[in-house]
């Protein structure tokens, strides 16, 4: 029996891969858009996450969803709020968390299957250098992109079947796959907590 993947989720994965609004590492936008995507691969349900990775994948995704729950409530002005204490905007935190996860996993997946591009959407690190990818997006839209990153990671997780938790994954500096998955969980929780602290600042926009 063939299982069908929801159309909205198909579009999420496809849009993430062709990256019409940003270039992938080492490729122009035109080349990224030309990456072949087989319709049958998208229409079929994704292969399950390898059993030995399920627990830590679930933990990473749960942390992402907790973060989405916080961002989803924010308006576009709140997402772009620049704290007087010089810390990052909530939008930077959303882009940074999703960007790091996407880059690390796409590096690994590309090493295992070169048809999958390396995707680097990481924002500049320093607040003064930061330029948002979508300055008009509200928190719901940023949360949807964060979910698409999780969808991408889960869809191609079958490539990790022969990599054990204590093994060093290819093409990254991470000492083990376990270390990467646990750090992604911590990363979401830490940055989300930093965003929540901004709500108590006197200049936080009330909307």
Q: Regions from the language model: what does each represent?
A:
Residues 41-51, 135:
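Acidic/histidine-rich, surface-exposed loop or edge segments in extracytoplasmic proteins
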Residues 21-31:
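Signal peptide processing junction and immediate N-terminal pro/mature segment
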Residues 54-57, 61, 143-146, 150, ...:
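Short amphipathic alpha-helical segments with heptad-repeat character
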Residues 60-64, 68, 149-153, 157-160, ...:
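Hydrophobic faces of stable alpha-helices that mediate helix-helix packing
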Residues 126-168, 182:
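Acidic/histidine-rich alpha-helical segments that form the ligand environment
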Residues 1-11:
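Bacterial N-terminal signal peptides that target proteins for export
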Residues 9-20:
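Bacterial N-terminal signal peptides
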Residues 29-38, 43-44, 57-61, 68, ...:
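Short, contiguous alpha-helical
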């Amino acid at each position: 029996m063939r299982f069908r993947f929801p159309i909205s989720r198909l579009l999420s994965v496809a849009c993430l891969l062709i990256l019409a609004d940003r270039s992938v590492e080492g490729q122009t936008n035109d080349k990224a858009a030309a990456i072949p995507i087989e319709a049958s691969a998208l229409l079929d349900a994704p292969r399950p996450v390898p059993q030995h990775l399920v627990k830590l994948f679930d933990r990473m995704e749960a942390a992402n969803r907790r973060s989405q729950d916080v961002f989803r409530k924010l308006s576009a002005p709140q997402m772009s709020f620049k704290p007087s204490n010089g810390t990052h905007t909530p939008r930077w935190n959303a882009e940074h968390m999703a960007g790091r996860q996407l880059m690390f996993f796409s590096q690994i997946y590309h090493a295992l299957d070169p048809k999958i591009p390396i995707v680097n959407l990481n924002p500049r690190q320093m607040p003064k250098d930061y330029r948002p990818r979508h300055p008009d997006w509200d928190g719901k839209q940023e949360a949807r992109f964060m979910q698409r990153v999780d969808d991408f990671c889960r869809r191609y997780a079958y490539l990790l079947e022969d990599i054990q938790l204590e093994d060093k994954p290819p093409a990254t500096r991470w000492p083990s796959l376990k270390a990467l998955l646990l750090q992604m969980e911590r990363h979401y929780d830490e940055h989300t907590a930093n965003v929540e602290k901004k709500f108590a600042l006197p200049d936080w926009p009330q909307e």
